[in-house]
């Protein structure tokens, strides 16, 4: 993965040098350029890779209303205008609500204004609602006058955050799987909030396609995968990593 990342950076560096040379001639922003704006909604979530053994059943999933808005520019670098480099900026939400039945699920909750850690068995509800400012950089290939494919990397900065929820209908063993038993029943809940443990910077990969309805309007699907986890490396209150994996569906306007 590191070699692939370095290869992409090297390719983009060579392209940037070529762009700079052309910019000296005053043609960079007018020659072989394409500009567009896009809007989308997203379906997905912050999820582990595979289902951990602690999660026995997902009883509810709500993707919520998650929207994004992007502006990007494509520079065609081949003479036939089939290959290009695209740079964009977008603001996007990533979120979901879930309910799951778990067993021996390591977590940290707040009870009577005190934090307690341990292994919980019962029901866990989670509410995630985060906003990012993202810069995607992609290689674009024009398959036909109506179809384009693209793929590349993105870097995101977290600007608004929420990762919270509660546990109920079960019990927690403090510190170890055989520790002191704390019971949550008859409507008793214990909250948790890991918002401040979310990673500020995230990066990942994206793959997408665009279909041109006409000269200006486009439809597109796009898959985003967060390569690094959503939590800081020192975060230990969940025993497995969570990654942002989302499918974006939307429309755009090409100028």
In which residue ranges do the predicted regions lie?
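Hydrophobic, lipid-facing positions within transmembrane beta-strands of outer-membrane proteins
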Residues: 35, 65-71, 131-137, 203-207, ...
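Outer-membrane beta-barrel "beta-signal"
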Residues: 211-217, 243-255
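Outer-membrane beta-barrel channels and translocator barrels
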Residues: 30, 74-80, 144, 214-216
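Transmembrane beta-barrel domains of outer membrane proteins
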Residues: 26, 70-76, 138-140, 208-212, ...
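Transmembrane beta-barrel strands of outer-membrane/channel proteins
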Residues: 37-45, 87-93, 151-157, 221-225, ...
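Cleavable N-terminal export/targeting peptides
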Residues: 1-32
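Repeated loop/turn-to-beta-strand initiation elements of outer-membrane beta-barrel proteins
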Residues: 81-85, 146-149, 215-221
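Extracellular/periplasm-exposed beta-strand and loop segments of Gram-negative cell-envelope proteins
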Residues: 45-64, 94-131, 158-200, 228-246
């Amino acid at each position: 993965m590191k070699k692939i990342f370095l290869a992409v950076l090297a390719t983009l560096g060579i392209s940037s040098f070529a762009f700079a040379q052309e910019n000296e001639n005053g043609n960079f922003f007018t020659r072989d350029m394409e500009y567009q704006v896009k809007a989308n909604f997203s379906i997905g979530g912050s999820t582990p890779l595979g289902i951990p053994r602690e999660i026995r059943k997902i009883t509810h999933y709500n993707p919520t209303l998650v929207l994004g808005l992007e502006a990007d520019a494509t520079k065609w670098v081949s003479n036939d205008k089939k290959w290009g480099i695209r740079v964009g900026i977008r603001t996007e939400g990533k979120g979901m609500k879930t309910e799951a039945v778990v067993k021996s699920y390591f977590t940290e909750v707040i009870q009577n204004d005190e934090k307690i850690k341990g292994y919980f068995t019962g029901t866990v509800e989670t509410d995630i609602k985060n906003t990012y400012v993202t810069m995607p950089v992609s290689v674009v290939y024009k398959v036909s006058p109506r179809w384009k494919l693209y793929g590349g990397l993105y870097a995101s900065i977290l600007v608004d955050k929420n990762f919270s929820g509660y546990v109920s209908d079960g019990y927690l063993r403090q510190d170890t799987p055989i520790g002191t038993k704390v019971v949550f029943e008859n409507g008793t809940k214990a909250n948790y909030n890991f918002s401040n443990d979310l990673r500020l910077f995230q990066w990942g990969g994206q793959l997408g396609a665009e279909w041109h309805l006409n000269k200006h309007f486009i439809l597109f699907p796009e898959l985003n995968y967060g390569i690094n986890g959503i939590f800081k490396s020192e975060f230990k209150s969940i025993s497995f990593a969570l990654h942002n994996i989302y499918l974006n569906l939307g429309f755009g306007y090409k100028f």
